[in-house]
Regions:
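Polysaccharide-binding surfaces and accessory modules of carbohydrate-active proteins
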Residues: 5, 10-13, 17, 21, ...
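Carbohydrate-binding surface patches
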Residues: 241, 634-677
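Aromatic-lined carbohydrate-binding/catalytic grooves of carbohydrate-active enzymes
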Residues: 324-461, 474
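C-terminal beta-strand-rich structural cap/linker in extracellular carbohydrate-active enzymes
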Residues: 693-722
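Conserved nucleotide-sensing/catalytic segment adjacent to the nucleotide-binding pocket
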Residues: 784, 793-852
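ATP-dependent NMP and nucleoside kinases share a basic, alpha-helical "lid"
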Residues: 856-904
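Small-molecule kinase domains that catalyze NTP-dependent phosphoryl transfer to phosphate-bearing small molecules
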Residues: 906-946
Length: 946
């Protein structure tokens, strides 16, 4: 069980996979916080200390005990008016203006499954994935009952918290402050990490030492805002990406919020998160209830990366509900930066044609398709299609776009109204404004009062009438201003609930529409929005270099799959910066990936580069979106921005690096990777170079020296699973080969083993042999790789000439009798070397052959201590070859061999008809020799013994 109650001590213990959260109902009925941190099975009530501290009052129920004070004890949900003079979580005012609620324990319930919040987004889970603890506290005199809700998702290492408040009295009360979570820590010296910003530059990381007093931030803008994200990390001073204690809080809410971190008089720390108490005063009549939105809490003892992974898993698995959350999503192109308001239906169709030719999946028609909207001064609220501008109906346009083989998306801004609109002229009172005062304009628009159902219904019906005109595949929901004219204390909260109601109705009616959130970019990038839309436009700033910072900060809580990121034109429309198409593409691949540009203005070379970009993204899309995301550097501190995605199985990894500035005579730059298997062997796809996971993580990879500013690189690593499987199979076949571990027959330590790896040209022999060697070395077994390419009678160029001569003189039968026989191969030489190795000779002359005439040498090689010789060679299964203990056959086909040879690019005639026929004849022999192999590596990667 994830939740345990000790009735003797009245201790609640909440256990996740790696953390423990504990609290206790004390003898006076107060709910005290005991512990949150690394997993523990101990009752932690011993951490409570009691001391008589001047001016820290004592509850009357404590009698004459001056050491008991709520001003110093760690509390689970502190309230105003109880003698706790620190920041509090709850403040309720009664009709007389008294602000005092003393919450005492009444009851609790533990149940399977995760609680839900009516009208609010919240983490969801099945009954076997989560448990709920509901603790009821109350103040009978004040007539208030508070239900503390805890959701425990054991596998995710997260605990959610929400609060349900009920007026149980006969009079009215007003909630003046309501936070969802409080965390009291009795020890430690902490930093606060918050994510500040502005429009077009959101979620910049700022780490501040928490001194005495309060550090607070939040939003009073009606949205979670560009300026501060509703997320916070409390970290010990020495915490880094990879080590140290840190706590996270993430508010699942899209409106006004507040976060308060306080270090008190005796160096205790209190962290609070919930609704902002500014512009908030919520009335409750007798019997009415109020729900505080949810906070997701998590703890990591292993630094920020692990904390991020826990949040990423929680959001992608238990917040996002869209069917698109784990699906391949379309690569889109948006009309905004391509045309802004200046477009027609033909413009959109032309964009679709260009998109199709580039491999783009979807065209999105952005702002300007409705009412009479040719600029941002009119028509918001009039959600009817401007058929004159589009040159026909929306249905016709959608069909024309779909006819190009691409999907169709559309932009909306349901919460807004222009004064120059039919809606405003008919219902001016539907716009939010303070009675008797003129409203505050922003972007020449006003905010509709979505706290009112009749307003929501009108807009919803208008939007549905548009969506029902054709198959719309995607919708971008925008929101381009803050709330200023707050006419009542309940407005800001009720407005957000109205938005959620609208979104719930929309996604329920149109489950097959991919919904992307937006608020001037990342002004409402929060977990509340992700409950309805699986992705959010990360920022209106598409500059690749700025985006490395924006996406870096975003990644601390939100998964890559949630970040809308596009390649835009240069000079960039926000910064004027020029970066290469490659750099822009690599940066945008750390998100949902798409384009914000006019393809008609691109050169043929740029278009071809975009085609290749899209192929690359689609190749790695699920690795990027579903893999584990690692931050490798900080773009705020380092000369490069680097990040990587690692598959859950750790068998694939994609590393991306962007240089942030250039420097003359620069030092070499290395990037250390993360999240790989230390002992595994990985091959880098582009170079064919092999590394162990330990080498990549501890030494890193050197970057090419910069030729120009803002260069970017990608490295793709694949774990050589066939080599590991082969190694395990070989160990079973030949027993323990470790040096110095002889058995009674001395066959283990003294006997030398010869393994041949053979298969068609380009079948991966060299790769498998090198990886196999590394696995032997990992196991402390000395191993040598010998290549069979050194043993033809002639250098490769002359050998191909001789093959052609044989064919011309004797035909195909003659060629068949030449290939792989002593006529072509110096079997005597290689058999001599293998024989000397097996006899135990330590110094052996090994033949080496180059690619030029006369480039043949015999080099003395020291085999002292070497127990295994791996021969990698096309003819490693030949009947003429002697001394092989374990022949290993790599299955392949002539078609695969041809493709690999061409890709390898080593032989200029690899695709010639003659060479292709040679490969086919060699394959005939290989197929026969393969039947004599001891071990076979199949085309499907399976390894088995024959």
């Amino acid at each position: 069980m994830a939740i345990i109650f000790n009735p003797n001590k009245k201790i609640f213990t909440l256990q996740t996979a790696h953390t423990t959260y504990q609290m206790q109902v004390d003898r006076l009925g107060y709910l005290l916080h005991l512990y949150y941190g690394a997993k523990s099975t101990c009752d932690m009530d011993y951490v409570l200390t009691y001391a008589d501290r001047g001016f820290s009052g004592n509850p009357y129920a404590a009698g004459m005990n001056r050491t008991y004070s709520l001003d110093t004890l760690p509390q689970e949900y502190p309230t105003l008016g109880t003698g706790d003079f620190r920041n509090i979580a709850l403040d309720i005012k009664n009709e007389q203006g008294t602000e005092s609620v003393e919450l005492l324990y009444k009851s609790h319930e533990i149940r399977d499954g995760k609680y839900a919040l009516k009208g609010l987004p919240a983490v969801w889970a099945s009954d076997d994935e989560a448990q709920t603890l509901e603790i009821v506290l109350g103040d009978d005199i004040a007539g208030v009952e508070v239900h503390l809700l805890y959701g425990v998702l054991e596998a995710c290492d997260v605990i959610t918290r929400s609060v349900f408040i009920k007026n149980t009295g006969s009079g009215n009360i007003t909630i003046e402050k309501a936070h969802a979570a409080c965390l009291d820590i009795v020890y430690g010296d902490y930093d606060v990490i918050r994510f500040y910003g502005k429009h077009a530059m959101e979620r910049n990381l700022e780490r501040t030492r928490l001194g005495h007093g309060t550090l607070s931030f939040g939003s009073r803008r009606g949205t979670s805002s560009h300026q501060y994200n509703p997320a916070v990390i409390l970290a010990q001073r020495d915490t880094t990406e990879n080590a140290g204690d840190c706590y996270g809080m993430l508010f699942v809410y899209s409106g006004n919020f507040s976060c308060e971190a306080e270090k008190d008089q005796i160096n205790q720390t209190r962290l609070l998160m919930g609704l902002s108490d500014e512009l908030f005063s919520y009335p409750l009549a007798a019997g009415e209830t109020f729900t505080v939105p949810e906070v997701i809490m998590s703890y990591s003892a292993d630094g920020f990366s692990q904390l991020s992974h826990q949040y990423h898993t929680c959001i992608s698995e238990h917040v996002c509900r869209s069917r698109f959350a784990h699906e391949v999503r379309p690569v889109l192109i948006n009309s905004w930066e391509a045309a802004y308001f200046d477009f027609t239906g033909d413009t959109i169709v032309d964009l679709a044609k260009e998109a199709a030719s580039l491999g783009i999946d979807m065209v999105v028609m952005d702002d300007g398709w409705f009412g009479k909207r040719d600029d941002d001064n009119s028509s918001l609220g009039d959600w009817f299609v401007n058929e004159k501008k589009l040159g026909g109906t929306l249905s016709e346009l959608i069909d024309r776009v779909h006819a190009q083989g691409v999907k169709f998306g559309i932009w909306i801004e349901p919460e807004m109204v222009n004064e120059d609109s039919n809606l405003y002229r008919e219902h001016p009172d539907w716009a939010i404004q303070i009675p008797g005062k003129l409203p505050v304009r922003s972007r020449n628009q006003l905010l509709l009062d979505f706290s009112r159902k009749e307003v929501r219904d009108n807009i919803f019906n208008q939007i549905c009438a548009v969506f029902d005109q054709g198959k719309i595949d995607y919708v971008k929901w925008d929101m381009n201003r803050s709330m200023a004219d707050v006419y009542a204390g309940n407005l800001a909260y009720d407005y957000v609930l109205g938005v959620y109601d609208f979104m719930e109705r929309l996604v329920t009616r149109y489950p097959d529409i991919l919904l992307e959130g937006c608020s001037g970019g990342g002004g409402r990038f929060d977990a509340g929005m992700l409950y309805y839309s699986p992705q959010i436009w990360c920022s209106d700033n598409t500059d690749a270099i700025n985006r490395t910072r924006i996406q870096y900060g975003t990644s601390f809580f939100y998964p890559v799959s949630s970040m809308g990121a596009h390649v835009s034109a240069v000079p960039n429309h926000q910064t004027g910066r020029v970066t290469s198409l490659k750099t822009r593409g690599i940066t945008a691949m750390a998100g949902t990936f798409g384009y914000e540009l006019n393809p008609a203005l691109l050169s043929d070379e740029e278009k071809e580069e975009i085609r290749e970009q899209i192929k690359t993204f689609k190749k790695y899309e699920m690795l990027i979106n579903e893999g584990t995301y690692w931050r490798l550097t900080s773009p705020f501190e380092d000369e490069v921005a680097a990040w990587m995605s690692v598959s859950r199985a750790k068998d694939r990894a994609l590393v991306s690096v962007v240089r942030l500035y250039a420097e003359a005579n620069a030092a070499a730059c290395y990037v250390k990777l993360k999240g790989l298997e230390s002992d595994a062997v990985y091959i880098e796809e582009n170079t064919g170079r092999q590394y162990t996971g330990a080498a990549l993580m501890n030494a890193g990879i050197p970057l090419p020296f910069a030729v120009k500013e803002y260069e970017a690189y990608q490295f793709s690593f694949i774990r050589l699973d066939e080599a590991k499987k082969l190694y395990d199979e070989i160990k079973k076949v030949c027993g323990n080969l470790k040096s110095g571990e002889a058995d009674s027959t001395d066959s283990a330590s003294d006997k030398r083993i010869v393994i041949s790896i053979y298969g068609g040209s380009g079948s991966g022999k060299t790769t498998i042999a090198a990886a196999l060697q590394q696995y032997f070395l990992n196991d402390n077994t000395a191993c040598y790789v010998l290549t069979g390419d050194n043993y033809p009678h002639r250098i490769p160029m002359r050998n191909d000439e001789e093959r052609l001569n044989v064919y011309n003189e004797s035909g195909e039968d003659g060629l068949r009798g030449y290939l792989g026989t002593p006529k072509e191969i110096d079997f005597d030489r290689i058999n001599k070397e293998l024989s000397e190795f097996k006899e135990g000779k330590d110094i052996i002359e090994i033949k080496h052959m180059g690619r030029e005439d006369g480039d043949i040498s015999y080099d003395e090689t020291d085999f002292t201590g070497i127990k295994v010789l791996i021969l990698e060679w096309t003819h490693g299964g030949s009947e003429y070859l002697k001394g092989v203990d374990i022949p290993v056959f790599l299955e392949s086909s002539p078609e695969e061999t041809k493709a690999r040879r061409i890709k390898r690019g080593r032989d200029e005639n690899a695709a010639s008809p003659f060479i292709c026929r040679v490969v086919e004849l060699e394959q005939e022999k290989l197929d026969l020799q393969g039947k004599n192999a001891r071990i076979v590596v199949g085309k499907d990667g399976k390894v088995y013994e024959q």
